[in-house]
Amino acid sequence: GDVYKRQILILGGTHFQIPAIKYAKSRGYHVITCDYLPDNPGHKLADEYYNISTTDKNAVLALARSLSVDGILCFASDPAAPTAAYVSEVLGLPGNTFDNICRFGEKHLWRQFLRENGFNVPKAIPYQRAEDIDVADWCFPVMVKPVDSSGSKGITKVTSALDLKSAFDYALSYSRLKIVLIEEFVERVGPQIGGDGFYGKDKLEFVCYGEQVVDERINGYVPCGMKFPALLSSSLEQRITHDIERAIRLSGLHDLSFNLEVMIDKAENIYLMEIGPRNGGNCIPEVIQYYTDVNLVAIAVEAALGNSVPVCPSNNTKCYAYYALHASKEGIYRGYELEKTFRFNIRNSYIFLKNGDKIGAFLGSNQTIGILLLEFDSRKEMDTFFDSPERYVSLYIE
């Protein structure tokens, strides 16, 4: 009879999960997807789709059990990571434990873990009620954020005590756990560092650093691009890599695809702001593959099935980036156009909206119009584009 097809359950069917779905299909795996949005574009590519929310741990567990899947994968989605861990732990599938993944995914637990292990960490206190905040505890500015939100949603920089309550309520509205973190503002020097990596059985096998780009005209916290490679001195890069490897080793996580956010202050202190226990959104794995030839999608899918993939990065003199098309005010999307001045190479593009769709201002990654994956001949070319993207790409919003 037929050779048994390995079955993988992939949580979510958005554009960002499509690379994982396509890769798994290309390997001949039987792909099952689930989320509560049947129209998501990834489901059409899967073998089976179930209308179950990716955050409903017990419903997803029941589904995985009834289908006896061989692996479960969270790819490029924060809220689904604890679900994948929970299911893999209960069913004995490849993966990490629920508690371990939550420690990395929930900001207050992450800050506590870093503090206990002697990493640099801004002062941070979680609160469930605004009344519990003692203003005397804080020197402004502070950052106010949900402990568990994804896509940079619900974050405010607060410069005076008068604005704390509204920032708290705003953050709370984006928190499923209903916990808000207040933390010292880190005065970083240079761009925020981002990127993805993979930690194997007992060591960091791969990491790639990029520089986050934000649109200061809107709110300055939602990344609208990432440039690769990051310009880091080799000594600073080694220190960052050492910190990341040490954090993951101490946590007990293994076979972990992760997304990272790192800040550096004027004293060259390194702050691991986030190690998200899943690959990055915004097509970061795809950009990294153009730059390094390392297929993070393959690594993540195979790890979910207990398989390993050799990692062999190649050298590349070109520069790569993603750019998120976004609106500075709400309106109706009427398409975009590359100007005559646009002389860069588009390796791929994903447009999420149709002409005539409503779009909001770019206050979270959920308001992304689309993503352009760009290749540049030099760092100078890349910087030229990002200095004023609107000179090269026109967006029509009415």
Residue ranges and their predicted role:
Residues E116, I133, V301-E398:
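Peripheral (often C-terminal) accessory segments that flank ATP-dependent C-N-forming ligase machineries
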Residues I10-Q17:
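Glycine-rich adenosine-cofactor-binding loop
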Residues G1-Y4:
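Short, small-residue-biased leader/transition segments that mark boundaries at the very start
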Residues G105-L181, K201, A230-H242, R246, ...:
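Active-site nucleotide/adenylate-binding loops and adjacent lid/helix of ATP-dependent enzymes
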Residues H43-P126, F362-T368, E381:
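Conserved N-proximal alpha/beta basic substrate-recognition cap immediately N-terminal to
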Residues A171-I179, V186-A230, Q238-Y271, G276-I284, ...:
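Phosphate-binding core of ATP-grasp and ATP-grasp-like enzymes
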